[in-house]
Amino acid sequence: MKLEKILNNIDYKLIKGSLDTEVSGLYYDSRKVTNGSAFICLSGTQVDGHDYIKSAIEKGATTIIIEKDVEVPEDVTVVKLPNTRKNLSLLAINYFDNPASKLTMIGITGTKGKTTTSWMIKNILEEDGHKTGVIGTMGVFIGNTHYDTVNTTPESFDIQKYLKEMVDDKVEYAIMEVSSQALKVGRVEGLSFDYGVFTNLTKDHIGEGEHENMEDYIYSKSLLFQKCKHGILNIDDIHYEDMIKNSTCDIHTFGKNKEANLLIDNIKLLRKEHFIGLELNTKGIIEDTFLVNTPGEFSAYNASSAILTTYLIGCKVENIKKALSKVAVKGRVEIVPVSSKYSVIIDYAHNGLSMQSILETMRAYNPKRIVSLFGCGGNRSKERRYDMGEISGRLADFTIVTEDNSRYEDINDIMNDIEIGLKKTSGKYIKIPSRKDAIKYAIDNAKEGDIILLLGKGHETYREINGVREHLDEREIIKDILNNK
């Protein structure tokens, strides 16, 4: 592809070389550069791509795209942009021939519920006969292909690459979790969404390398509703008005507020063998009853956002109902079939807020006991450890403290920090360093009516120790324990 085509509709300055230069590929990682490609220099908080120009040229880059004035060898084409990171998305859109324009784009933002909502929408669309692709916290899913990702919303170039693959694979609907950070730094610059979904907003992601304050966090979230045609929003959320203040889309709402287009009329919690979920009655645009295969009042909100979105798309209500009755999201309040006498749930809850939410949610189902099993990540905030220890000690009947991704810290030091929080309560607990042994202890000591919560790992199937990821899948551990009982 000619460089000129890649720069279409972008403000640039040709420093030297030719716009007729053929570009065989676009790269922002100098280690991946191939012969005849263009290297885009991104200025990050820790790494500056301008420092790797020499390495990129040695690997065969014939075009360098910069935002700073730097020395570049004579025989290389150089283009200067005002902001390479924001323009990376536009460059990639041009390079991949704007794949989003060939898809129906659904973007989901919110502090909690993005992953569950995206999978609910995916399941409904597939039940209605459509092919989907998903980009989010659990990775990228295109048909039967799965790619792991580092961020909830990948780098802008990678987003376009995945969208192009979806187009090639005849996908109709692309469902994307859109983080506030992605909106802030421009990873979705130039992307238009057909549907934008807002789940909720609570204080999170405030600090170094994220958002400087709550105002910045709120504003960043609201940007999605300047990028979509239809906005589907939680009208009950305290920040609903902030989300729509500068919106340019049609607004559709869900919630308990009588003004909601889809009114949450009644929620009935249900627990039976291998099922912990709810019955949701709606009024307004849809008057019906939905059985939802995920527990808690927050699941009613996630389900309502999915119902309203897919209804606006044109899915049949009977298919929406069918999909929600069997939806299962890996690592998100995931019920593992074990026994008719007690329940085991795997969930990604890995901070105080999410832990409190799931513990309070499960208490509403009146279990005999709630057993909370968790650890905390190494080389991370100690405050989180104290917080989670105290919350588990206060809200669970019994706590099992174990390992998580200890990284470069001693597991026992992390458990001791969690114990500090636990000791602020009267909660009973035990410390078991091996997660496998901890799960076995929980199952061996389960009582009728118990709900055992395995928290923190969720969809992850590894543990990280001293920089090495080792395979660890809680589902496999549970299966082995039950097979050997």
Residue ranges of each PLM-predicted region?
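N-terminal leader/targeting and accessory segments in enzymes
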Residues: M1-L90, N94, Q226, I238, ...
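ATP-dependent carboxylate-amine ligase
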Residues: M1-Y12, N35-A38, T248, I285, ...
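Acidic, Mg2+-coordinating active-site environments of NTP-dependent enzymes
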Residues: L7, E71-D75, D169, D194-V344, ...
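Phosphate-binding loop of NTP-binding sites
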Residues: L7-I10, K86-G231, I235, H239-D250, ...
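Short glycine-rich anion-binding loops that position phosphate/pyrophosphate groups of nucleotides
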Residues: G44-Q46, V70, S180-Q181, T202-D204, ...
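A short, gly/pro- and small-residue-rich
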Residues: G49-T62, V78-N87, D194-N200, E215-Y219, ...
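Short internal beta-strands
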Residues: T62-K68, I232-D236, L373-F374, F398-D404
